[in-house]
């Protein structure tokens, strides 16, 4: 491989060096093109200096190779001279053609250049004889060439002429290009004289033929002569060639344009006013485009809550029609159209139009504020009602969730439920003094609508069907759209119990500007009030000594059906049931949910027939025993035999759980019909007895010292029990066993007297305090008695309940999870109960510890500590243990 050769090329006192790294593969055409580009020349003649310092022309590849050999001898360097124009061996061209050519090139090259070119051409020509100058004889100068080939001088002339025409054409194109590129500096006057081609001899013959721009360099502040560099993005920035080679104070990302000469032959004044907005050529515009940041605008849907007309907790009269207004702001960049609607999510507040679940919103532009309105009707029953909504555009939800929350006041007229209750109870005052106590309970705030249903069932059978129908229609539930429910909504505590707004005194105001929390914050100094259930009211009635007598068999059946519809509407408000059905519907796709689940009345009766044991020591729950006329005397020694049965089954969820798996005790004989297996329990806890009302005319046998019940007529009932006597809600007190006892059915009782005086044994302390959280609603009071068809109906309800329980594995799992969450929620926010410290023996403590071990809580010390902390309430202990384990799992995972 040949060594590298350095070519030192000189053109009119301008020297440039070229390094030929691979001379063997570098051709003469490459060198010639490189020199033309470097010096901005079109036609050149290159000569090099040999050893004798004589100029030798290079016109071919062979001559170039000889020059490379000479460079090796001179230390791998070669001195080269560049001359404009080619060596032409012809005479002077005809005068006419020459005149035209000079006229065409006026202002391009000085006249001395062409005169010198003529002298060079004339000196190299071989002049013929006298006559040859005029006649151009071909044979004289080309004796050795064929006749059809033109003479050399003619060929050379045509070649020179062609090159000159091409050069002129290129220069004209450059002129048009520079008219767009050359932008004037505003500080140098309105009409830039430096752009026009000067015609003075001084300008034409500047050193190295460089043009003076009459522009000061922005870096060195000297006049720019020769090559000028102009910023393509900043037209007012110009620097000279020397400053461009070194550091200069400008953005290095801006492209600099190299300009050798200005616009040529500009006839019109080139003023700033004419070219106020100069544009760069398309090629440079393409270079500038990537430098501009691209900020695409993405369509976004967003909204913000601004204001409302009815704040949360507004008191309204029943049946009042009102319109809720929300002021919403379109904070996105998409205009709201007819496809933008306010969709109903969930709630129990009655709509003015039950079919209008989607409300049109105003067509708001981005940044505008409008009013969204929904018309509601206040329900007939007093309480707190809410309705939740959210904006949606073509099925895509956006913006904060808004809601309407009102409090319906009691009836102000004489026909209010409380006044009706007053009338019914006052009519029975003459029968017994205890009816006055019952009136006090019925007028309490917690009894509200269910107290009305209870009294109507006991008092008048004619008005019950219509009233129950009204109650069921007023408590109509709306099933939300599954598409609009988000994970945030499903996990919200507001969906765990859709009546959560009825447990709080008020609901916080809507949170504005798109900040909807996962759960509405609890108001300060607001106690948690649970909506009383039917079982609670029965407990209150029983605690006051009130006992209602049964109706006739046909009337009781009809009332039971009506009460079932009322209770069905009440149970439909369970948030657990609602969320479970929503999730199951989303899992089963097209399967429609059963929004009217089987009446809990029957399913609970099935459960009452089985001795399902609840959590021990729960001060919020009471054993409800149904008896008819007198208490059954039980021995104290039987308690120890049944104590083991108390610990067999424990429910880990709250009293609001839907279904249970019951482990039957050994004493329950499944081979006999249900009517033959009858149980009765006695409460012999010293100093404390609790009773609750069951079916109409059924009284709990709880007082050991009592011999019988005294009816208004003074007659005593025989010691017999109906089949409904065996149904007990095993919400436990302190270690009270179930003692089986077989009894017979009693004769039907007259319904003439609504009250029966209830004698309690001496020392019996009847509780009158309403617990914060009610027990499971006792819904068996509407069942008929004394028929074999009752047994079949209860067995059918048992089968139906088991089928409903096992209908969906996924639904069961979801129910269980949400029940536990609801239990934790209620356990968190329910205040500590005010009860006496229970007396728990060592055996009972050991049984509780064994239950906790079976559940998987094996920390004996922690279990004992929590049992003492919660007064041996195993439900609260399990709830706290679950929370501790859940917190530990979360901390280990994250």
From Swiss-Prot:
ZnF endpoints (ZZ-type)? 212-264
Q: Which GO terms describe its molecular function?
A: ubiquitin binding; zinc ion binding
- Cystines in this chain: none
Question: Which amino acids does the record list as binding Zn(2+) 1?
Answer: 217, 220, 240, 243
Q: Which GO terms describe its biological process?
A: macroautophagy
**UniProt GO cellular component terms:** autophagosome; cytosol; late endosome; lysosome; M band; phagophore assembly site; receptor complex
- Span list, region Disordered: 630-656, 678-721, 776-807
Primary subcellular site in the record, as a coarse category: cytoplasm
Q: Which PROSITE patterns match?
A: PB1, UBA, ZF_ZZ_1, ZF_ZZ_2
Sites binding Zn(2+) 2 sit at 231, 234, 250, 254
- SMART domains, A to Z: PB1, ZnF_ZZ
The UniProt comment on domains reads:
The PB1 domain mediates interaction with SQSTM1.
The protein's job, in short, is: Acts probably as a receptor for selective autophagosomal degradation of ubiquitinated targets.
This protein's name:
Next to BRCA1 gene 1 protein
Query: What organism is this sequence from?
Result: Pongo abelii
């Amino acid at each position: 491989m040949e060594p590298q050769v350095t070519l030192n090329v000189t053109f009119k006192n301008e020297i440039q060096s070229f390094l030929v790294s691979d001379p063997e593969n570098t051709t003469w055409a490459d060198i010639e093109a490189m020199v033309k580009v470097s010096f901005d020349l079109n036609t050149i003649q290159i000569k090099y200096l040999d050893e004798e310092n004589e100029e030798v022309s290079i016109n071919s590849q062979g001559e170039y190779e000889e020059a490379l050999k000479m460079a090796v001898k001179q230390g791998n360097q070669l001195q080269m001279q560049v001359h404009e124009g080619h060596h032409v061996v012809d005479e002077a061209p005809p005068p006419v053609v020459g005149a035209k050519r000079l006229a065409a090139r006026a202002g391009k090259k000085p006249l001395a250049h062409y005169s010198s070119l003529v002298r060079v051409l004339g000196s190299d020509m071989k002049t013929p004889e006298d006559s040859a100058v005029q006649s151009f004889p071909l044979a004289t100068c080309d004796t050795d060439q064929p006749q059809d080939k033109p003479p050399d001088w003619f060929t050379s002339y045509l070649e020179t002429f062609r090159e000159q025409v091409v050069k002129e054409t290129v220069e004209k194109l450059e002129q048009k290009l520079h008219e767009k590129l050359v932008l004037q500096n505003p500080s140098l006057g309105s009409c830039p004289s430096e752009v026009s081609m000067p015609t003075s001899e001084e300008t034409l013959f500047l050193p190295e033929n460089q043009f003076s721009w009459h522009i000061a360099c922005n870096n060195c502040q000297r006049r720019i002569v020769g090559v000028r560099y102009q910023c393509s993005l900043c037209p007012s920035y110009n620097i000279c060639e020397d400053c461009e080679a070194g550091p200069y104070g400008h953005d290095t990302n801006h492209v600099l344009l190299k300009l050798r000469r200005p616009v040529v032959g500009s006839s019109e004044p080139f003023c700033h006013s004419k070219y106020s907005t100069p544009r760069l050529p398309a090629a440079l515009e393409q270079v500038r485009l990537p430098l501009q940041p691209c900020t695409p605008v993405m369509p976004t849907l967003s909204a913000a809550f601004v204001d409302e007309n009815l704040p949360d907790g507004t008191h309204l009269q029943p049946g009042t029609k009102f319109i809720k207004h929300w002021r919403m702001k379109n904070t996105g960049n998409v205009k709201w159209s007819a496809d933008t609607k306010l969709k109903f999510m969930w709630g129990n507040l009655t709509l003015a139009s039950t079919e209008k679940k989607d409300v049109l919103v105003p067509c708001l532009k981005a940044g505008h504020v409008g009013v969204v309105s929904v018309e509601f009707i206040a329900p007939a029953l007093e309480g707190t009602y809410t309705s939740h909504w959210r904006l949606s555009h073509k099925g895509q939800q956006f913006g904060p969730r808004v809601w309407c929350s009102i409090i319906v006041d009691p009836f102000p007229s004489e026909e209010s439920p409380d006044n009706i209750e007053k009338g019914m109870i006052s009519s029975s005052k003459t029968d017994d003094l205890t009816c006055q106590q019952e009136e006090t309970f019925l007028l309490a705030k917690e009894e509200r609508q269910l107290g009305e249903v209870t009294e109507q069932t006991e008092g008048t059978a004619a008005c019950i069907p219509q009233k129950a129908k009204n109650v069921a229609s007023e408590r109509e539930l709306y099933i939300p759209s599954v598409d609009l429910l988000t994970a945030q909504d499903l996990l919200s505590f507001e969906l765990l119990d859709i009546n959560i707004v009825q447990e709080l005194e008020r609901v916080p105001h809507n949170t504005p500007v798109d900040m909807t929390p996962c759960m509405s914050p609890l108001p300060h100094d607001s106690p948690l009030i649970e909506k009383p259930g039917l079982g609670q009211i029965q407990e209150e009635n029983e605690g006051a000594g009130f006992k209602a007598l049964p109706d006739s068999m046909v009337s009781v059946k009809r009332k039971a059906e009506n009460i079932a519809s009322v209770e069905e509407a009440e149970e439909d408000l369970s948030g657990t049931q609602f969320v479970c059905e929503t999730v199951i519907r989303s899992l089963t796709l097209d399967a429609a949910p059963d929004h009217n689940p089987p009446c809990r009345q029957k399913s609970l009766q099935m459960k009452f027939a089985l001795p399902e044991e609840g959590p021990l020591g729960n001060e919020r729950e009471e054993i409800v025993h149904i008896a008819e006329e007198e208490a059954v005397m039980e021995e104290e020694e039987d308690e120890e035999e049944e104590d083991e049965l108390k610990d067999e089954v424990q429910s880990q969820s709250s009293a609001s759980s839907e279904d249970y798996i019951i482990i039957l005790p050994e004493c329950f004989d499944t081979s006999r019909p249900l009517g033959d297996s009858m149980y009765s329990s006695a409460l012999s806890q010293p100093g404390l007895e609790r009773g609750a009302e069951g079916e109409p005319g059924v009284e709990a046998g709880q007082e050991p010292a009592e011999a019988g019940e005294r009816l208004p007529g003074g007659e005593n009932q025989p010691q017999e029990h109906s089949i409904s006597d065996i149904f007990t809600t095993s919400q436990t007190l302190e270690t009270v066993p179930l003692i089986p006892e077989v009894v017979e059915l009693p004769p039907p009782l007259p319904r003439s007297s609504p009250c029966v005086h209830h004698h309690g044994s001496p020392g019996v302390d009847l509780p009158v305090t309403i617990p914060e959280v009610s027990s499971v609603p006792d819904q068996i009071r509407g069942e008929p008695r004394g028929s074999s068809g009752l047994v079949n109906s209860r067995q059918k309800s048992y089968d139906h309940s088991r089928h409903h329980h096992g209908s969906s594995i996924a639904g069961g799992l979801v129910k269980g999870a949400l029940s536990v969450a609801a239990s934790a929620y209620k356990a968190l926010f329910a205040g500590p109960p005010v009860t006496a410290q229970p007396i728990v023996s060592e055996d009972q403590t050991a049984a509780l510890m064994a239950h906790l071990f079976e559940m998987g809580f094996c920390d004996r010390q922690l279990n004992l500590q929590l049992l003492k902390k919660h007064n041996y309430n195993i439900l609260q202990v399990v709830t706290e243990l679950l929370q501790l384990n859940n917190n530990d799992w979360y901390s280990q995972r994250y």
